[in-house]
Each structure stands twice: as structure tokens, then as C-alpha cells.
């Protein structure tokens, strides 16, 4: 039995594995781009299949493709979407910057599978052509950016945003639950005036709420599709209604608000929509990194750190120190945030490097974008499930640190002035006294006045958490 078969493209014949659906151009790419291990993301492959499915339907409706061929292409695309042909898409991220080879990989797989569905024999009889039928009314230059936007929007809506909302809700519940716990604040890693633990966490909640708004603000641009622009944005070789109809069809089959891009030249020449959307993801990464760092600092200890909160003990933390437990969820989250920030640099460089009518950094851009979405979504889910929901206050430690803080002296500013208050704090620190003892020793106020004026619970403003 033959292990290879001959496939042809415009450059001639080439042997491909007999058991594979791909054709000549995919094989050439496999042989010419054996670079690293990163493959085209499955979600991008599925977005390409969705795009081809929608195009076949619209081409049929416009009388440009027979019902028989269109139906076979759609059935083949549905098989790809069901995961039946995942091993038919082996191409590397590091290929042509337009994604042409992955577009042709999809065209060849769908054409060969559709031909089989129509009774053809693989490698012997082509009833559906990869270019003339599957790629009808299309160019790689508008197909690949369309698939990028489809994959990106669906990932943001279905993966990232739900996890962001869940984590925000968890922290909001913690903020409300801890609204009456007065603790010492810290600025510059030094003691500061008091606030409540609920107020502190409310800041985290507000950060995430702003991140959600920024991400949602970017979605309409991502929902704009390049399909119909063909090679350079002019729409050469397309029906006048094709672009609008294919965007409408994609909106229907994905239940997402896709529209045809109002300017196809921008849609082909830039990656601006994903650059801007990823900027919002970078902002989310910055916020999550700050939150994770705060959590692990507040939970540091258990005896020699800040120790104001406890977090779940999920696994042993050391191979040499018995009983040690580390803030591993915080560490995982901060690492992935660093990766997202690195991805943002690469996406910015790729987005800025397009020339004339086409950006040719697209595979790298979408690879990094989808990785960032996946990392952030998975990271938030893990952090929420294994850390945030289990945050609990250590009230005894909180009260100890609060009562030992010299910054409670700030409450005296309006009564005896900044200079005298500072003198009290310095004397207390230098001589190891309490603030009250130092104040009384200096004779600046009476014991009754100190007890009346230095009351931490009255120094936090509204006891509400700012929600």
C-alpha cells in the first residue's frame, strides 16, 4: 500500500502522506518551515473553518457556487469544528506573515474532504477545488485577518470575560464581608494611616471593573471583519453584497456581533484592533499582578511576616523545609502576567511593522493574543478557585499591628499640629514607647485627649468599602 500520493499546485507535483487530507501547499510549508514547536492555535483553525463555512453559504446564496459543492464544504467544515480533523493542521506559527499557508491548509483539507463526501477518491479525483471553490470570493489577505478577529472575539467573550466577572464578584463579596475590620495601611512599604480590609479589597474590585470596561470597549473594533476586501482591500473578484452577507452569516452561526469592516484597507493593512484589545489585556495583567502581590504580602508569614490574612494551603511548599506552605497561586498568576506583558511588546512590534496594503506579522500576533487570553482566563479561574475564595482575616494579628503603628499619630495633626505630632512619633520610635506614653511624656496633651482623638475606627472615613 502506498504511503504517499501525488498532489499538484501551481508549482507542480509533490508527494504528501497518503492518509492526510492536506495538499501540495501544506506539504511545501511543512518542508520549508520546520521552525520550533509552536503550531497554529486550534481556536484559530476553527475560526478559519467557520469563515469557510460562512463563505460557502453566501457564495451559494449569491449563485456563485453550486448547492452540491457548498453543502459538501459546509459539512467538511463542521467536521473540522467538531475536532475530527485536528491532526490535519500541522503548520507552524513561523510561516508566511499573511497566514497564506494556513489558509491554503484549510482550503486543501476542506476541498479533499468535500470531494470525498461527493464520492471522489482522495488523490485521484478532485470534485471540489481548494482555490476555485473553497476559497471563492476570498484571498488569504482577508480570510486570515477575519479568522483572527473571529477567534479573538470568541475567546474574549467566552473565556476571559466570564472568568474576570467571577473573580471580581468573589473579591467584592470579600470586600463587603471585611468592611468592619480596621487595619493599618501601608504606602512605600511603610506604615501609613488606617483603613478597613474591606476598603483595601474594594480597590482591587474597582481595578478589575475598570479592566472589564476597557476590554469591552475594544470589542466592537475586533468584531469588524476584513472578509470581502480580497487582496488589497478593493474587493476584487467579489459580489457587491458578499462582504455584508458573509459577516451577517458569521454573526448568525457564532451568536457574536460581527460586522463587515467599514474600511477594508485598514482591516488588511493593520492589526490595530488586536493591538488595542491586547493593550486592555496588558492592563488586566498589570492589575492582577498588583492584586496577587498584595495578597501574598498580606499573607506572608506565618509568624514572621505581615500575616494579616490567611490563604488556602494547597500543597507542600518546600522539598527541604518541613511544614512550609507557599502562595503558589499568587506566584503562578504573577508569572503569567509577565508573559502577557511580553506578548504585548511582540504584538505592538508586529502591529507597527506592516507595510503598505498588508500586515505580515499576523500568525505571531494571533498566537500571542490567544495565548494571553488563555493564560489570563485560566489564571483567574485558578486564582479564584484555589486562593481568592479562601481569603480570611487574621483579626488578632491585624489588631496587633494596628495598635503598634506610629502612624496613628496622624490623627493629632489637626489638634496639636504636624510638628508636635511628628515629635511624638519620633520619640515613641526611638525609645520604644507607645504613642500615648510619648505624648504624655512630652506634655502635649492629656490622656483623655489622646484617647478621644486617636481612635483608628474614626480614621477610615466611611466604614463602607467604597462600593
Curated annotation (Swiss-Prot):
Pathway: Carbohydrate metabolism; tricarboxylic acid cycle; (S)-malate from fumarate: step 1/1. It comes from the Bacteria. CDD domains: Fumarase_classII. The active site is at residues 188, 318. Changing residue 129 to N: No effect on fumarase activity and essentially same conformation compared to the wild-type, but appears to dramatically reduce binding of ligands at the B-site. Optimum pH is 8. Belongs to the class-II fumarase/aspartase family. Fumarase subfamily. There are 2 substrate-binding sites: the catalytic A site, and the non-catalytic B site that may play a role in the transfer of substrate or product between the active site and the solvent. Alternatively, the B site may bind allosteric effectors. This is Fumarate hydratase class II.
Amino acid at each position: 500500500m502506498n504511503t504517499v500520493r501525488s498532489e499538484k499546485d501551481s508549482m507542480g507535483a509533490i508527494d504528501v502522506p497518503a492518509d492526510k487530507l492536506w495538499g501540495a501547499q501544506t506539504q511545501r510549508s511543512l518542508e520549508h518551515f520546520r521552525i520550533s514547536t509552536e503550531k497554529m492555535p486550534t481556536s484559530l483553525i476553527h475560526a478559519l473553518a467557520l469563515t469557510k463555512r460562512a463563505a460557502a453559504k453566501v457564495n451559494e446564496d449569491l449563485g456563485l457556487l453550486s448547492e452540491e459543492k457548498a453543502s459538501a464544504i459546509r459539512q467538511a467544515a463542521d467536521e473540522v469544528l467538531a475536532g475530527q480533523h485536528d491532526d490535519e493542521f500541522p503548520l507552524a506559527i513561523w510561516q508566511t506573515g499573511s497566514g497564506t499557508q494556513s489558509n491554503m491548509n484549510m482550503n486543501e483539507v476542506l476541498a479533499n474532504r468535500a470531494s470525498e463526501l461527493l464520492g471522489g477518491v482522495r488523490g485521484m479525483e478532485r470534485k471540489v477545488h481548494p482555490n476555485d471553490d473553497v476559497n471563492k470570493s476570498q484571498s488569504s489577505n482577508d480570510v486570515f485577518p477575519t479568522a483572527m478577529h473571529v477567534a479573538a472575539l470568541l475567546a474574549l467573550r467566552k473565556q476571559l470575560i466570564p472568568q474576570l466577572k467571577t473573580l471580581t464578584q468573589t473579591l467584592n463579596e470579600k470586600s463587603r464581608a471585611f468592611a468592619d475590620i480596621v487595619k493599618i495601611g501601608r504606602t512605600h512599604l511603610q506604615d501609613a494611616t488606617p483603613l478597613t480590609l474591606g476598603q483595601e479589597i474594594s480597590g482591587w474590585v474597582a481595578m478589575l471593573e475598570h479592566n472589564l470596561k476597557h476590554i469591552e470597549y475594544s470589542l466592537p473594533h475586533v468584531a469588524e471583519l476584513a472578509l470581502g476586501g480580497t487582496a488589497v482591500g478593493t474587493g476584487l473578484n467579489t459580489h457587491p453584497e458578499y462582504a455584508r452577507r458573509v459577516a451577517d452569516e458569521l454573526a448568525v452561526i457564532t451568536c457574536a456581533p460581527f460586522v463587515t469592516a467599514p474600511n477594508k484597507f485598514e482591516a488588511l493593512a493593520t492589526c490595530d484592533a488586536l493591538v488595542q484589545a491586547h493593550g486592555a489585556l496588558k492592563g488586566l495583567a498589570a492589575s492582577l499582578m498588583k492584586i496577587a502581590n498584595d495578597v501574598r504580602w498580606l499573607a506572608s508569614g506565618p509568624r514572621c511576616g505581615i500575616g494579616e490574612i490567611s490563604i488556602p494551603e494547597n500543597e507542600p511548599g518546600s522539598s527541604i523545609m518541613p511544614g512550609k506552605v507557599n502562595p503558589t497561586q499568587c506566584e503562578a498568576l504573577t508569572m503569567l502576567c509577565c508573559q502577557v506583558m511580553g506578548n504585548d511588546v511582540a504584538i505592538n512590534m508586529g502591529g507597527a511593522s506592516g507595510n503598505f496594503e498588508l500586515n505580515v506579522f499576523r500568525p505571531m500576533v494571533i498566537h500571542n493574543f490567544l495565548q494571553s487570553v488563555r493564560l489570563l482566563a485560566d489564571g483567574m479561574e485558578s486564582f479564584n478557585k484555589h486562593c481568592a475564595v479562601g481569603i480570611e482575616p487574621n483579626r488578632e494579628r491585624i489588631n496587633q499591628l494596628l495598635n503598634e503603628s506610629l502612624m496613628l499619630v496622624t490623627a493629632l495633626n489637626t489638634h496639636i499640629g504636624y510638628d508636635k505630632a511628628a515629635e511624638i512619633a519620633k520619640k515613641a520610635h526611638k525609645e520604644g514607647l507607645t504613642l500615648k506614653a510619648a505624648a504624655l511624656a512630652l506634655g502635649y496633651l492629656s490622656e483623655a485627649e489622646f484617647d478621644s482623638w486617636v481612635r483608628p475606627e474614626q480614621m477610615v472615613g466611611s466604614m463602607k468599602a467604597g462600593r
